[in-house]
Amino acid sequence: MNTRNRLAMLTSAALLACWLSSASTAADPARPEKNRGTAQPLLTQDLPDIPGKEVVVLTVTYLPGGASLPHRHDADVFVYVLEGSVLMQVDGQPPVTLGPGQTFHEGPGDIHRQSANASATQPAKFVVFMIKDKNKPATRAAD
């Protein structure tokens, strides 16, 4: 992986990790240790056939009861659940609970209203695969 791609991957993951940490703490300020999510970067890769776009792949782990605040990615985001149970919802759609092997999609205009571990006792882990504009943040708060 070249230095530019590595820097982009680390920057995207750092922004997402900071956002997950602060958003999760806000969900239950009395128990910040209970709600933290962590993001682990796996890959950032330019898409030469789609100028100006890149793929970002990472894993997100929620501790039991963990959640994030409403947000958007301005990207096509595909989620694949590895373990545990995850509650997902975008505006205009009913919430869904996903288990291992199940998938979820967020479109570029979607506000991701709910992203949470559906269990109060077990962690949840999922892979995030996003196609996004280069040099733009991976995640931002919902308007």
Please provide the spans of the model-predicted regions.
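A short, N-terminal "cap"/entry segment at the start of jelly-roll beta-barrel domains
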Residues: 2-10, 16-56, 89, 105, ...
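Extracellular/periplasmic catalytic domains that process cell-envelope and extracellular macromolecules
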Residues: 50-52, 72, 97, 118-123
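Short acidic-glycine-tyrosine-enriched beta hairpin
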Residues: 52, 62-63, 92-109
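A short beta-loop-beta micro-motif enriched in histidine and acidic residues
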Residues: 53, 65-78
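Histidine-centered metal-chelating micro-motifs
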Residues: 67-69, 87, 104, 108-117
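Glycine- and acidic-residue-biased ligand/ion/polar-headgroup-sensing regions
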Residues: 73-92, 100-102
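Ligand-binding loop in jelly-roll beta-barrel domains
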Residues: 95, 109-136
